[in-house]
Structure formats: structure tokens, C-alpha cells
Amino acid sequence: MNGKEIFLVGLSHKSAPIEVRERVALTGDLLKAALCELRAAESVAEAFVVSTCNRVEVYVQADGIEPARRFFTERAPDADEHLYAKIGVEAIRHLFRVSASLDSMVVGEQQILGQVKEAYGLASAAEAAGPFMSRLCNRAFATAKRVRTETDIGRGATSMSQVAVELVEKIFGDLKGRAILLVGAGKMGALSAKALAVLGADRILVTNRSPERGLALAEQVGGAFRGWDELPRLLVEADVVIVSTGAPTYVVTRDLVQQAMKARRRRSLCLIDLAVPRNVDPACADLGEVFAYDVDDMEKVVTATQEARRGEALRAEAIVEAEVMAFAKERDARAALPVLAQLRRHAEQIARAEAERTLSHLGPKLDEKGKKSVEAMAQAIVNKLLHGPTARLKAAAATGDGDLPGAAAELFGIDNDPARPEGAPAQPAEGRAAASSERS
């Protein structure tokens, strides 16, 4: 480590309504720009951002939490009351639980791991995530894989798309003959289409801005592709519309639905919006015979499935906790390494200087063998003197006593900054104390 701590600031379906989440959700170039902005902060060493339909979370390795908090308040000034913040082991535990889908609206859902992997990949490509985030994220991914392999937490409806399809089935019963329109052919759209096909839906319509992607999905599920410009007419034809595009604004507007309802002659229309930011104008729900649901409404459908999965979730929590403690122990042990390296370098410099002074006094009295004996003796003294302190520093770090390595650095007047180039002068003890005071 580099003297910095890991901080997490975020909001999720548990802490904030969709109206707040959609204002801070970022994708594509906007997310890349946000990563660069975070990394540019002087106090931030590494960063990555998880942004999904149910959560936006900022992880930073930094001197303090403010850069992560500012990410939210600059985008949504009223977000502060919905934020949660975690530091150190608590932040590590949270990421592990999120990756293992234990903090998801649908516990056991499979999409979140891919989303966190994608978030880390983007941060790595933007050079915002470095060696610490690499170790952290890869350990979180391995933990999620253990949970998936060693428990049955993934049984039943395990994605928002599957939950949406379950809702459709509850409303209509038999799906045969029902016209179901999928607006968007991305991951959510594909999962919805496959779940519908399994339940026997035989009139699946797909529309997408990119015809190639839409055609491919329609062929996979035996559906029909329609052009994006046909959306107004498709809203007249469909019984159910499931919307999940990457658009940052409403795709299905109130005016569009109002016009469609005039032509439907009092036939009800079910709108399910799986996107964040929302793609269906919430004002559509005010229209007669229109039943609109967004991702927050899905939580009511999820409850029964969650109860059946409670036992597996407890087993998964135990796996996560064991992995968190193991990672934290390794992290703390690493914290001692820079101190140990500097302590040994400091001692060896003194030993070499004293050996050279002794040899210069003895002059020609010593042959080459005698000189080597003096140098070997100096190194042996260093090794014996440092053996005990080295063992105690490693043990202290491994048991979470993070104060001892810092105290050792202060006691011996050595630099505990791994970012300092090799051979550069160490910062004086009083300078380090002042810098530490400024950060706190």
C-alpha cells in the first residue's frame, strides 16, 4: 500500500429512488471522463466506478473520502442524503458482497458480476485502476465464483429481465398469442427474450436502433424484427412492452403512448422499463388502461423468490466473510513491506559505511580475505539485528496492527513512501508529520 486507504461512496436501490439514481448513472464516454476526473485529484491514487440500473458506487484509494463524495454531489446536489460511505475493510466487504450478488435486488442474479468486471476493465483501460484495485477486484471476482460454485444461490429468477417476465406471466397467465414488444436488443433485452421464449411466448417483436443486433436477437428466439421508425405502430399492436435501451432519455414518451391508446380502443397496455436512466416516461402511468412498472417496482415481485433463497444466501455470506478477512490480512501484511525494505536499506547503508571506515583505518594491514571477513561480519550483524523486528512487524501487520510499521518508520527516521524513486532523499520525520497532519 502507499499510505492511502480504500473508500467507497455510493447509492443503490436500497438508499435512493430511481429519480436520484438516474441522475448520477454514467455509461460510455461520460464514465471514462468521470474516471479521469477522479484520478486527477491529487489525493487519489486509484479509482473505479460501478454504474448499473440499481447502483452507482465510487471506489477510491485515497487520502480521504471527499473526492468520491464530490462525484455525487456535483451531479445531484440532493444526493447526499441517499449516500452511504464505507472505509477500509467495510468497503472491501461491500465490493465482495456486491460482486457475489448478495446486495442485489434479486439476490443470486448473474449480471452484476459481469457489470463489476466491466467497470474494473474500463477503469484499468483509463489507467484509473492500478495494482491495488487489480488485487481487490480479482479477489472479489474469485469470491463471486466460489459463491456461484459452492451454493445454489443462482436458482430461480436471477435477473431483472427474468423478474420482469415473471411479472408479465402473473398479469396475463398464458403468454401464447400475446404480442410482446422488446425495445432494445442489449443484454437486458436478450435475457428478456430468452425468458419469454422459455415460457412459451410465440409473438415476440423486437425493435432496436441497430438493425443488425435486433435481427440477430429476433432470429434467436423465433421472433420478428421491426424497424425503429415503426415504434408508434408497434405500441398499438403490442400487449406488453419491455424497454431496455442505453438511451439517456425517454424513448417511450407520454404523447407516444397517448396516441397509441386512442387506436387501441380501451385495450390495456403493460409497460415495463428496465433501464436506468428510465426510458419510459413515468407520466405514462397516468393514462387510462396503461400499467407502467420500472426497476423499483420489480422489488415487490422479487420478495417470494428471495425467501426461498435465504438459506443459500447465508452460506454465501460465510464464504464472502472468509475471503474478506483473508484479503484484509494480506493487505495489512503488504503495508509492512515498504517499512521493512527501507529499514533494511537504512541498516545496510550504515553497516557499509562503518565497514569502509574500519577498512580505511586498517589500511594495508588486511589482505583481500580479511576485507571480505569484515564486510561479511557487518552484513551478519545487520541480519541478526533485523531478524526480530522484521518478524514482529510482519506479525503485527498480519494481525491488523497497522500502527506498528508507521511507528517503526518514525523511530528509525526512515521514509515509508513506496512512491519515492529509488535513491531519492527520504522525507525528514518532521516533514512527514506535517504532511500527515494536512491530510487528516
From Swiss-Prot:
Segments of this protein annotated with the region Disordered: 406-440
Site for Important for activity, residues: H94
Pfam families, sorted: GlutR_dimer (PF00745), GlutR_N (PF05201), Shikimate_DH (PF01488)
Catalytic site: C53 (nucleophile)
EC class of the enzyme, as a word: oxidoreductase
Claim: Oxidoreductase is one of the keywords in the record: yes
GO BP, sorted A to Z: protoporphyrinogen IX biosynthetic process from glutamate
Keyword annotations from UniProtKB, A to Z: NADP, Oxidoreductase, Porphyrin biosynthesis
Residues at which NADP(+) binds: G184, A185, G186, K187, M188, G189
Annotated catalysed reactions: (S)-4-amino-5-oxopentanoate + tRNA(Glu) + NADP(+) = L-glutamyl-tRNA(Glu) + NADPH + H(+)
Recorded GO MF terms: glutamyl-tRNA reductase activity; NADP binding
Entry EC number(s): 1.2.1.70
Protein role: Catalyzes the NADPH-dependent reduction of glutamyl-tRNA(Glu) to glutamate 1-semialdehyde (GSA).
Comment on protein domains: Possesses an unusual extended V-shaped dimeric structure with each monomer consisting of three distinct domains arranged along a curved 'spinal' alpha-helix. The N-terminal catalytic domain specifically recognizes the glutamate moiety of the substrate. The second domain is the NADPH-binding domain, and the third C-terminal domain is responsible for dimerization.
PANTHER family recorded: GLUTAMYL-TRNA REDUCTASE
Extra remark beyond the main annotation: During catalysis, the active site Cys acts as a nucleophile attacking the alpha-carbonyl group of tRNA-bound glutamate with the formation of a thioester intermediate between enzyme and glutamate, and the concomitant release of tRNA(Glu). The thioester intermediate is finally reduced by direct hydride transfer from NADPH, to form the product GSA.
Subunit text: Homodimer.
Name this protein carries in UniProt: Glutamyl-tRNA reductase 1
Lineage: Bacteria, Pseudomonadati, Myxococcota, Myxococcia, Myxococcales
Annotated gene: hemA1
